[in-house]
Amino acid sequence: MSRRSTTTSTNFGLSWSLVDVISSSTAVFKVPMNGGCDLWIGCARWLRDMKVLTTDKNGTMLEFASVLRDGILLCRLANTLVPNGIDQKKIMRTNQPSPFLCCNNINYFAMFCKTYFNLEDADLFTAEDLYYMNGFQKVLKTLSFLSHTKESLSRGVDPFPDTDNNQEGTSNGSEFEDDVEIYQSLHDNIENVDPNRTIYGPITSADPEEQQSEQLYDRIVTNRKPSMNENDLQNTPTLKRNRCIRELYDTEKNYVAQALVTIIKTFYEPLKGIIPTSDYNIIFGNIEEINVLHTALLADLEYPVKVALGLSDATPPRPISLNECVPQTIGEVFIKYRDQFLAYGKYCSNLPDSRKLSNELLKTNEFISRNINELTAQGNCKFGMNDLLCVPFQRLTKYPLLLKELQKKTDLASPDRKSLEEAVEVMEDVCNYINEESRDTNAIKVIDEIEQSITDLSMPLNVKLHDYGRVNLDGEVKMAESTLTQAGKPKQRYIFLFDKVIVVCKAANKVMAAKTTGASARTNTFTYKNAYVMSELTIDKNASLDVKSGGTITRRTQYVIIMTRDRNENNEITQLTFYFKNEATRNNWMTALLLSKSNVSPTDYLRDTNHKVAFHSFRVDVKNPATCDVCDKLMKGLQYQGYKCESCNMSMHKECLGLKKCEAVRKSTHETRSSQSFNCNRPRFHIHEGDIVVANSNSTPSDLSYLQFAKGDRIEVIKMQGHNRFTGCLINNRNRTGLVHLDHVSQSRTTSMIGLSPIDSPAGSIAPRVVRNESTVLPNKLLSDGSSRSLSGPHGSRSSRNSSSSTINGSMDSVPRQQDYVNTEISEFLWYMGEMERAKAESTLKGTPNGTFLVRYSKNRKQTAISLSYKNDVKHMIIEQNSDGKVYLDEDYIFNSTVELVQYYRSNNLIEIFAALDTCLKNPYSQCKVFKAVHDYDAPSPNNEGKFLSFKTGDIVVLLDTVGEDRGWWKGQVNNKSGFFPLSYVKPYDPATEGSSSPVTPTSSSS
């Protein structure tokens, strides 16, 4: 899983005009101010007086609205008016804007208003009114009503608007209806504002309880006394360092004696048996374990502190066991106790529940309340039990600061310097570990609530929605789902983007009865529509604009994200398109999608390492914590903390993936060279996409990415994945998909052999770099939109073409080894172009996108070659053949046939064998729609963001999209530039008929 900065602002008077500034530049709305200005400024003033807002300045109305949007300040206001009016545990905080969480908070506030102030729906606003800024005047109306209640007035705070004749409320005030136009700009511009970058930013994190705990820590632990003036003549570097050492040691003594021992002796031990065991364990958590830790740490600190201070009575402690290494420096003490500090993870995660439960017992259980009060008095405690239980969390956060300050004041030549630097890293690592554990604990609760809100989502036994990773973004998106033959219509959907899957829902806000008063409040509920596995999706980073209707391409511009999905059936969804009204929202979603994709498929981090990794959840064990094998730091969080390599078994953080190469690959490569005759990973039979296989055993995998099936089940092969695995689905339940290992299946007698797979080769064990952990539990829904237009290409469906070759590869022995003629087996594939020389291949592939390829037979060399378009150039690779008739591009990767070799490199990066080629064989040239410019076209000026594509007569234009075709426009690419162009300016291009006129660069050799 925040960086905050503030911008300056100005106090505005009542005579100014509203100018909302976005990104410190653009004036987006301007209207003479009247009552509307008075209202929001009055509301901001009232919230400041109520101590909910902590800034003494006004920003713009847009900034003010943005900080109310997540509902946290409203919940804080509710608890200011009525203490504990909203359960603190229910208030949801998030690092990124989440409509689901924000609307939940707003709904809690609405329920509070109905429960405690009997507000009617007419006096309330909905979550949509605030979050989407559809009715900000309603928000001000509700808050104005609350400002006139006795709970507010009793605090001596003036209400708003400040009128002499209305002291009971403003629910019927016309000023809220007269100025609706003032708030209309908020809806269009709210997405462009980051509340953390406004003048109000710091208030969103200023939790009053945290501030109170900080003050309490200072009183109990720090207990600062007046010290010498920093400018004192004797304030030498040594004295400064000694003061740091004393502060560290003295505060540790105070922490143990004044906080931990007091908790244990005054409350923890006496209350055992008085408070029910389950409640007792929640309230105190593992405080005893923390007390043991710090008692030992304090004892170990004594000797290094005395040595550092130069005290004469410093006596080295005796080790209590043969294996114990007694710390000699302050830094070594903290390094020694790193793993024990992880006990704070459980304590800090439990702290909110502890505070809530103890407060409830103090209010509702007279017997327990009386005992706690008596124990407080008997122990002469200046602070309550709840206050003391918050101190450990505050103490933990101080260690990195104290050690870092001591490090700064320690000379570089000091023998203590190195251990201090390491101690700072260790304690920062520990604090990050605790933060991630607390964050994941909260995130899992949120995801469980999301799962409950999707009313018709049916999950398999022992599988939860949070098993698919963290939620990286959620919100309403207009989305189209298209198949090979149907272009889907854009529909409003609610998307939950997890690390591993995209869950598609439809918002269905229902009215739920309140348990206490019979009132009703809107809650977030959804109906399940579909789900998509991130590892199966390819995100188009270039497509960004879509243009709809009107007489010109510049009208109704929408921002889009396009994702494609490998599927062969006509009724299976192959493309997802997200539509957005503005670029900022699109960029947010693109960033989140790329994050999810990168998490499950971190290919950019794996370059040249040969690791084969899977996104992995490491077992959380504070006694023996998982650490990264590269940096030796902790694997943080409760799930999917990092990656594990299947070859060398290394555990790694994401950022450490590229720092160390896989040693297992070197070993296996050597073994392959020395013994090509045997490969334990080679399957006993050949299967291909579209085949039907039969399960030869039951499989109930613990890994959610694998398919669950019973012996005898028939399974269809959807996609070969390498490493003797494929993605398959049950014939009797095609909604269930997942990985299947070849050891668990056998060939069906009715299997159709339609082509070879890379899994069949001796190199089959060299799997893709990222192990694809597909989903097995989320059902898919087929698209059935009869009104959609066809998307099929000129070649039609691949399945019909492949079916004709069903018996070609029945036996590997029948494949001729001789390669001095065109192999009829190869001719069945779209990528094979027959006889073609190097120059012709270059002119054919000129200008095509990266990864476009063809396979050709060179009559001159009597060899088969692959020609590939890459970075505005055409690369050629000769397919070599050994004495056994096997083929290869590199001798470490041997294949039985050319078909097998090509299929392998369609899903595996060529960088494995060619350092200069960072691509796979993506698209056969025959499937690439290529046109030739018949007129010059110059993009209009200004050509903002390269929306239009310029070209010259004779240029080769690759068609990317037919969007805008009904208005005479296509989207295409020339070299590495893309954009819209008039479709009448090009004609179909066929190298076969235009070969003589195509520009050809002579070469010295032909292949």
Curated annotation (Swiss-Prot):
Residues 163-174 have a biased composition (Polar residues). SMART domains: C1 (SM00109), CH (SM00033), PH (SM00233), RhoGEF (SM00325), SH2 (SM00252), SH3 (SM00326). Residues 782-814 have a biased composition (Low complexity). Residues 240-437 form the DH domain. The modification Phosphotyrosine is found at residues 183, 200, 217. Residues 153-176, 778-817 are annotated as: Disordered. One of its GO terms (cellular component) is cytoplasm. GEF activity is regulated by phosphorylation on tyrosine residues. The keyword Plastid does not apply. Disruption phenotype: RNAi-mediated knockdown results in male tail tip defects. Residues 470-598 form the PH domain. Residues 831-925 form the SH2 domain. Keywords: Guanine-nucleotide releasing factor, Metal-binding, Phosphoprotein, Repeat, SH2 domain, SH3 domain, Zinc, Zinc-finger. The keyword Zinc applies. InterPro entries: C1-like_sf (IPR046349), CH_dom (IPR001715), CH_dom_sf (IPR036872), DBL_dom_sf (IPR035899), DH_dom (IPR000219), GDS_CDC24_CS (IPR001331), PE/DAG-bd (IPR002219), PH-like_dom_sf (IPR011993). A zinc finger (Phorbol-ester/DAG-type) spans 610-664. Residues 688-750, 926-991 form the SH3 domain. Residues 151-239 are annotated as: AC. One of its GO terms (biological process) is cell migration. Acts as a guanine nucleotide exchange factor (GEF) for Rho GTPase. Has a critical roles in the generation of rhythmic behaviors: feeding, defecation and ovulation by dynamically regulating the concentration of intracellular calcium. Plays a role in male tail tip morphogenesis. This is Protein vav-1. It comes from Caenorhabditis elegans. The gene is vav-1.
